Amino acid sequence: MLRFLKPFPLRFGKRFYSKVPPVTNHERILPKQPSFPTAPAQNEIATLTIRNGPIFHGTSFGANRNVSGEAVFTTSPVGYVESLTDPSYKQQILIFTQPLIGNYGVPDCKKRDENGLLRHFESPHIQCAGVVVNDYATKYSHWTAVESLGEWCAREGVAAITGVDTRAIVTFLREQGSSLAKISIGEEYDANDDEAFINPEEVNLVSQVSTREPFFVSGGDGMLNIAVIDCGVKENILRSLVSRGASVTVFPFDYPIQNVASNYDGIFLTNGPGDPTHLTKTVNNLRELMNTYNGPIMGICMGHQLLALSTGAKTIKLKYGNRGHNIPALDIASGNCHITSQNHGYAVDASTLPAEWKATWTNLNDQSNEGIAHVSRPISSVQFHPEARGGPMDTFYLFDNYIKEAIKYQKSRTA
């Protein structure tokens, strides 16, 4: 069971707070997931068709259904469970560059840690629409595994194809850019059927992965209170906060956080899928928040882009995005390079930042922006994922810095 905050009001140090909205939920409330047949469509003929591109034939090992979405690739050698449950991959067709996938199976989706957070998954369900691998491991072995990757995909309604040349697919996407694609199960398919190529980024994908109602996760003594704007939050972001002693209140992406921000020691903006320009209400809320709130604000991934948009800066769509656990990012202030975990198709155009903002991180592969900060206030964000899961832990310290700022702000309010 989740450990949660006591009924309101809350007490922090010498100051008494009682305006936090009464929340009775202790788990995220997500849109209802459709049910699918549980038997995998194994050894069925399957086809990956890239719009205005090549066609690849293989065999299915997932759900017996046709799907479409934006074809993207990840260079992560491990962590397919974490990648597939990352909400930032919502409705995308994910191609793995690692040739062998599925060899350690899938752990129990119901296992939770001492804070009630999912132990092995980044969200309750697979988020991508389809999975593409070169060689699917039909036999798996790991002490935490309870089912195969194919069984999991079938149960979640996710189409999966193996036996295709993923190197050729990635080469095409790298040269031509991310493209719409579809996976068809069975012998009948129409490569020119444009109606089958559905562009998920034409809609607000964040609304499909954000909690419908606020919920609590409590950590440590609960004396530090952080408000999280959920654009598709990964479980390990919440874990990274509560493991540092924070109690976390998670709000829907479009919640008017500016109305309750004074009750919190920090505001946190999470990752999420799709085009950030769809979230005009969230951007307007953040703009108003920064006009009235003096505490620390931190953003990750989508949160980074939304923070930039709220300042008046612009975002751009990358040619094929950055997705993997081995991407170098430069800390401009120190000159140090860190290996980071990333998953995004958009980036902030640093040249459009207002004068009171500065770029703080740069991607060393494509020179895109990886971080911004206000020059005088404790507001900052990064494009990469310091919480990892999977990936390197080089930038874990960014959570420590944020918590230190939240404690500092709390003390200034209770003095």
Curated annotation (Swiss-Prot):
It catalyses: hydrogencarbonate + L-glutamine + 2 ATP + H2O = carbamoyl phosphate + L-glutamate + 2 ADP + phosphate + 2 H(+). One of its GO terms (cellular component) is mitochondrion. L-glutamine binds at residues 88, 272, 274, 302, 305, 343, 345-346. The keyword Transport does not apply. This is Carbamoyl phosphate synthase arginine-specific small chain. It is found in: Mitochondrion; Cytoplasm. InterPro entries: Anth_synth/Amidotransfase, CarbamoylP_synth_ssu, CarbamoylP_synth_ssu_N, CarbP_synth_ssu_N_sf, Class_I_gatase-like, CPSase_GATase1, GATASE. Its EC number is 6.3.5.5.
